[in-house]
Every structure is written in C-alpha cells, then in structure tokens.
Swiss-Prot record:
This is Thymidylate kinase. It comes from Ralstonia pickettii (strain 12J). Keywords: ATP-binding, Kinase, Nucleotide biosynthesis, Nucleotide-binding, Transferase. Phosphorylation of dTMP to form dTDP in both de novo and salvage pathways of dTTP synthesis. The keyword ATP-binding applies. The gene is tmk.
Length: 205
C-alpha cells in the first residue's frame, strides 16, 4: 500500500505551519490503528543537506535562477531521502511547502519563466505529485501585519507587497488549474473555523 502525500502552501504569514502541526496530530491518531505513521517535513529543508541549503536560500542574496536551482536541488534530496521512502513504506507525508511554492515565489514573485520551472519539476520529481495540496489563502497586507511583530524577517518575508501579490496570484492560478488536487482555505478566520474545515477534509482522505 502506497502512502499519501499532503502539502501545505500559502504566502508567509498565512498560518499554514500552525495548522499543519494540528492536522498531523489528527492524522496520526487516524492512522495509528492501521500501523502507519505520519512523516512531517518541510521545504526548503527536510534533510541535513536540505537544512543547510535552507539557511543559504533564506538569508543569502543570489541570482534568481541560482535560487530556483538550489530549491530543486534541495527537493531532489528531499524526495530521494525522505518523501519517496516514506510513501513506499505506506506511510503518509505532510510537507510544509513543496513545488507549488517554487512556482509561486520564484515564478510569480520573482518572475522566472514558468516553462523553466516546469522542466526542472519534470526532471527532479519524476512524476511525483502531492495527493492533496491545502492552500491557505490570505491577503498580503494581512499576512504582513501578522509577521510584523513575530520575528526578524528572512529575505522572502522582507519582500515587497507587490511581490506577495504576484506570489498569491500564482498560487491561486495553480489552484484553479488543478481543482481536484487543491483545497483553498480562507486563512482570514478564527483558528477553530479553519480547523473545522481541516477536520472535514481529513474525513475524506
């Protein structure tokens, strides 16, 4: 039995990471009687090499194509060392970001040609796609207000409002193009309301 691959997406400040922890806990309770486990991971990162690349990607300035290539290099290692082995074992994987983030941030935000990203996606993922992608949708100005007092921003969090408008637009474009894979949640609500939606989704998986 092959496991399932769930990804959480959204612009910085949308709240996806908070809800991911709760969702993973609920899913593990559901899978435990079946002898399966939930592997929680993130991108960029997820492996020792990926975590080192994460530090470079979040804090070092670089050419936009270099940035995209490093994202996919980290992803190849992540798939080979974490994601695919877990799925092959019948376990479930939940990742805080995956390739949709690269299309949204490097494609939408940075303006990198989508066809170049698609070529890298095809090479690196070899057909692997998430079973379901949960997109936490939030207006950039609200997300920025949430982040203002949270912590010192990394280079992506410090980007302009226009950058995040483009990033959000690309996320929504991808969601509209793949409605069977994406679940779009309004992230500008109370936590309990969002968790209710996630609970309903969990029942369908």
């Amino acid at each position: 039995m092959t496991g399932k691959f769930i990804t959480f997406e959204g612009i910085d400040g949308a709240g996806k990471s908070t809800h991911l922890a709760w969702f993973a806990q609920q899913l593990q309770a559901k899978l435990a009687p079946l002898g399966k486990k939930v592997v929680v991971t993130r991108e960029p990162g997820g492996t020792p090499l990926g975590e080192r690349l994460r530090e470079v990607l979040l804090h070092e300035r670089m050419h936009l194509e270099t940035e995209a290539l490093l994202m996919f290099a980290s992803r190849r290692e992540h798939i080979a060392e974490v994601i695919q082995p877990a799925l092959d074992a019948g376990d479930w994987v939940i990742s805080d970001r995956f390739t949709d983030a690269t299309f949204a941030y490097q494609g939408g935000g940075r303006g990198l040609a989508i066809d170049r990203l698609e070529a890298l996606e095809h090479w690196v993922q070899q057909g692997l796609q998430p079973t379901k992608t949960i997109l936490f949708d939030l207006a950039p100005e609200i997300a920025a207000a949430r982040l203002a007092d949270a912590r010192t921003p990394d280079k992506f969090e410090a980007e302009s409002a226009q950058f995040f408008l483009r990033t959000r637009a690309e996320y929504l474009r991808r969601a509209a193009a793949e409605p069977d894979r994406f679940v779009v949640l309004n992230a500008n609500r109370e936590r309990s309301d969002i968790q209710k939606d996630l609970e309903n989704l969990l029942a369908t998986l």
